[in-house]
Swiss-Prot record:
Belongs to the HypD family. One of its GO terms (biological process) is protein maturation. It comes from Rhodobacter capsulatus. This is Hydrogenase maturation factor HypD. Involved in the maturation of [NiFe] hydrogenases. Involved in the biosynthesis of the Fe(CN)(2)CO cofactor. Fe cation binds at C41, C69, C72.
Amino acid sequence: MKFASEFRDPALAKGLLAEIARLADQIGATAEKPVHIMEICGGHTHSIFRYGLDKLIHPGIEFIHGPGCPVCVLPRARVDECIEIAGRPEVIFCTFGDAMRVPGSKLSLMQAKAAGADIRMVYSPLDALELARRNPGREVVFFGLGFETTTPSTALAIQQAAREGLANFSVFCNHITVPEPIRALLDDPYMRLDGFIGPGHVSMVIGIHPYDFIAEDYGKPLVVAGFEPTDLLQSVLMVLRQISQGRAAIENQYARVVPEHGNRVSLAAIADVYERRPSFEWRGLGEIDASGLRIRAAYRAHDAEEKFGVGYAGQRAAVEEAEGCACGAVMTGRMKPVACAQFGKGCTPEMPLGALMVSSEGACAAYWQYGGARAAE
């Protein structure tokens, strides 16, 4: 299988593990004083556990799981606002499937659907656009959610709706950006991070230079990585080489997919449709300056926040996390999922307490799927 099996070669993986061990010993990394490397992307977290890299790698390397899952960092208040919109009789509310079971303060979208709201799972914002064409008497709202990876497709749907004059199509925009929460983590005096594995899919869109501040301002290395086991091992090795050489740079291990300057067509669509919010709330991190996107005035007719007066366009109420939920601590690397008192007890994939157990990219779901269920017994 071209571009997959080549990156799962056991002999190559063994060689990388040996070189990682040599460098880890050289810089004095031990289980008691490990090198902390944060993998930002939830997809990387799942790959690490799927291939058992956390068990195979030198004990002086510790993976810290970052806030790179857009469903997981969505605060409960935004889920409540989705349900408020979806509960209107004129609305068809469209969402990706992984957002359906994320708990709000009282209900999830799945539970709201069971209670009678017209909520539909779609695979693309273009599916929602087609629903708007077929239902001119209904308001079709797409739940725009995700990092820079999914932001362009939502932008293209908004542009198309504007061209067609589809006034009954709007987007509840929850698109967020990756670099800003990394800065927030680095500014946290309680966080000890020695390097980063940068997100592959996000970087396909934005390129590698938006991360330059990590090396220039904080002196930390970041390596953009692919998702196969040897991709991740090579990225760890590249981070360790920088540390051993006393330097910090942004490097691109995933050069077969990620262009240095990103995807210019996607970036142009993002720039046309969106502008930065002054701040946006992240689960576990609070409000982070300039970390969220909102729809520009030129496309305001397709902005569900403005149309329905919810969210940042209306009166927002603070919503606390569910009692006992430690998602915030897990997403900011302060706690491993199995250290949470609710893991496998009050919080399971069947009955999730927090978003990290729901999403396909959540750290708690990864721990559960790849052996954490046994640890909880």
